[in-house]
């Protein structure tokens, strides 16, 4: 039988400054088919030594609970922001709203520098795709809610913004996780 899976490892930009290798060793690569336990994987017939064949399409996991796709970062954020823009279309707002997709975040926040210089926003929300690192015993578990990134090396969220987001999530019944990141987002350029 065939089951979709995704390969993963700790991204190189999250190991920066740790003294660890910048390219993962083969033994550091994990394959995740979305099963919640070894027993569940075995119940589907998965065994050590099974053959893996690369596939880059977007698909559901065998248990139907998750989506597998390559390069989520930052496609997921763009999808969320475009859906938000559609839902606000035609509504009267008490402010000016600019929605964009910045480029070259991983190599110096270049797009964010350009857009924040041009528009000089009073509030900037960076919608990004943070890693679900629960496989590696770290923070960010799939299915446990959105990650509220309150700190990363390039940005510390203002306390009032953090309180606003927490209150909004709690009042709306939105599941969230606290997230302290090793890598940064476009918010690092926006707050300067």
Explain the meaning of each model-derived region.
Residues 1-192:
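N-terminal hydrophobic/helix-forming segments and targeting peptides
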């Amino acid at each position: 039988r065939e089951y979709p899976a995704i390969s993963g490892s700790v991204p190189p930009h999250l190991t920066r400054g740790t003294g660890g290798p910048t390219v993962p060793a083969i033994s550091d690569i994990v394959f995740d088919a979305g099963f919640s336990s070894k027993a569940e994987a075995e119940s589907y017939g998965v065994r050590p030594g099974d053959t893996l064949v690369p596939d880059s399409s977007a698909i559901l996991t065998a248990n139907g609970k998750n989506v597998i796709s390559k390069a989520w970062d930052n496609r997921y954020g763009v999808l969320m922001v475009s859906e938000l823009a559609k839902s606000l279309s035609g509504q009267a707002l008490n402010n000016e709203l600019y929605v964009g997709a910045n480029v070259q975040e991983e190599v110096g926040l270049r797009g964010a520098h350009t857009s924040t210089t041009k528009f000089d926003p009073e509030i900037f929300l960076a919608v990004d795709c943070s890693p679900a690192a629960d496989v590696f015993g770290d923070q960010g578990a799939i299915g446990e809610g959105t990650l509220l990134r309150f700190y990363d090396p390039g940005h510390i969220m203002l306390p009032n913004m953090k309180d606003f987001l927490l209150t909004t999530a709690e009042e709306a019944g939105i599941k969230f996780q606290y997230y302290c990141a090793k890598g940064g987002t476009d918010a690092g350029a926006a707050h300067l």
